[in-house]
């Protein structure tokens, strides 16, 4: 099986965590694309979805799934999203799709975070995949210098403006042995909107598409 088939396996397995009448938080990315397709088969059972990006909103509506405003809820029962990398502690790098800020907000408001990945995303140490940081544009020079101080190589992601009107710095060669500390450090920098390091709010369940089937890891 190729990676897309493994992603699809994990995405469809997430339906086991969907219950009638609930509102589903929905992430962004290629694996989530398969989850939205799967979710459309039970759309008559759920109350709707909260979307983490404009691109996911388009896909949800295209599949006939009602999209709701997050601000009308105090919490969500479940959030389903993928990750660019995930370690053994279920901490993640996310934001390859530039939706990290909304993803963090929805994850924080959700009782259960189900992460759907293919087996290539599982790592021992985070950082092989570049770490995304959403920043306001005027802060690029300052934040880049601060990232260099902690050993990372910052690069502006070209031709990308986030749904919030900001830009993305991708940090290369930053191998993250202490994810919680790094998350706090970067979040404290003036001009940072959000960092794509999910170290404090980890996944509750990870569904991993493998050649042998779907592996389930619970926190």
From Swiss-Prot:
**One of the record's GO molecular function terms:** ribose-5-phosphate isomerase activity
Q: In which pathway does it act?
A: Carbohydrate degradation; pentose phosphate pathway; D-ribose 5-phosphate from D-ribulose 5-phosphate (non-oxidative stage): step 1/1
Question: What are the alphabetically sorted keywords of the record?
Answer: Isomerase
EC assignment: the record states: 5.3.1.6
Its top-level enzyme class, in one word, is isomerase
* Residues the record marks as active site: 103 (proton acceptor)
Q: Does the keyword Cytoplasm apply?
A: no
**Which Pfam families does this UniProt record tie to the protein?**
Rib_5-P_isom_A
Q: Which CDD domains match?
A: RPI_A (cd01398)
The residues that the entry says bind substrate are 28-31, 81-84, 94-97, 121
Q: Which domain of life is it from?
A: Bacteria
So what does this one do?
Catalyzes the reversible conversion of ribose-5-phosphate to ribulose 5-phosphate.
Q: What family does the database annotate? A: Belongs to the ribose 5-phosphate isomerase family.
Query: What's the protein called, per UniProt?
Result: Ribose-5-phosphate isomerase A
The species is Buchnera aphidicola subsp. Schizaphis graminum (strain Sg)
Q: Which gene encodes it?
A: rpiA
